[in-house]
UniProtKB/Swiss-Prot annotation:
GO terms for cellular component: cytosol. It comes from the Bacteria. Keywords: Hydrolase, Magnesium, Metal-binding, Nucleotide metabolism, Nucleotide-binding. Substrate binds at T14, G15, N16, K17, D18, K19, T84, F176, G177, Y178, D179, K199, H204, R205. The lineage of its organism: Bacteria, Pseudomonadati, Chlorobiota, Chlorobiia, Chlorobiales. The keyword ATP-binding does not apply. Gene3D superfamilies: 3.90.950.10. This is dITP/XTP pyrophosphatase. CDD domains: HAM1. Its cofactor is Mg(2+).
Length: 226
């Protein structure tokens, strides 16, 4: 009979359902008995303000906040947070850390994906240089049960990126965010025209998640959890 391992939860520090949909399948395949939960699943409602000037800083900020919130509730868990930015060369790397809040909107009005896409295309009007890249940084903070009964502390980051071009108009109905106007390098389709599995196999977030999953897997192996 296989030994029963302590319950371990990976808490996705996001309220973005689209991100959860992309992250969950990769993390659920890590090991048996690993539970992947979003903040909504745990009945938590927190919005961490992204005040850091880098993707790394914002990802750590969110992972730290979720760790403090979850620590009294769960014995063994990993808080996993990400921050993603679109870096457009012709715009000096903008929108970067401001990607989610790029378009100017009136106070009190909710900013939409479409607002950001329209603003980006407006800023890119007439520009021949359309190279860009998506970058995702994932921060992990948590604790796992060591074989000797103590705790293994986790605190680190992984990252992933993909180069591509900004199209002149939106194409495709899939994905989210800037996906309709980002064509990965070497492809004549945008992220929004790819299936979710095809996108995850090459995307910045997919690459960062794979790197994070590898590190988590190494920690689990260290703790004797398969």
């Amino acid at each position: 009979m296989e030994p029963k391992h302590p319950e371990i939860t990976i808490v996705l520090a996001t309220g973005n359902k689209d991100k959860v949909r992309e992250l969950k399948p990769v993390l659920e395949a890590l090991a048996s008995g690993i539970h992947v939960r979003s903040l909504h699943d745990l009945g938590l409602d927190i919005d961490v303000e992204e005040t850091e000037p880098t993707l790394e800083g914002n990802a750590r900020l969110k992972a730290d906040a979720i760790f403090e919130l979850v620590a009294p509730r769960l014995d063994w868990f990993i808080a996993l947070a990400d921050d993603t930015g679109l870096e457009v060369d012709a715009l000096g790397g903008a929108p970067g850390v401001y990607s989610a809040r790029y378009a100017p909107v009136p106070e009190g009005v909710a900013r939409t994906y479409e607002d950001n896409v329209r603003h980006l295309l407006s800023e890119m009007r007439g520009k021949s240089k359309r190279t860009a890249r998506f970058r995702t940084v994932i921060a992990m903070k948590g604790r796992l049960p060591a074989a000797n009964g103590s705790a293994v502390e986790i605190e680190e980051t992984t990252d992933g990126h993909i180069d591509g071009l900004i199209t002149t108009e939106p194409k495709g109905n899939g994905g989210f965010g800037y996906d309709p106007v980002f064509a990965p390098e070497g492809m004549d389709r945008t992220f929004a025209q790819l299936g979710i599995d095809e996108k995850n196999a090459i995307s910045h977030r997919g690459r960062a998640v794979v790197a994070a999953a590898k590190r988590i897997g190494e920690y689990l192996s260290q703790c004797g959890i398969q």
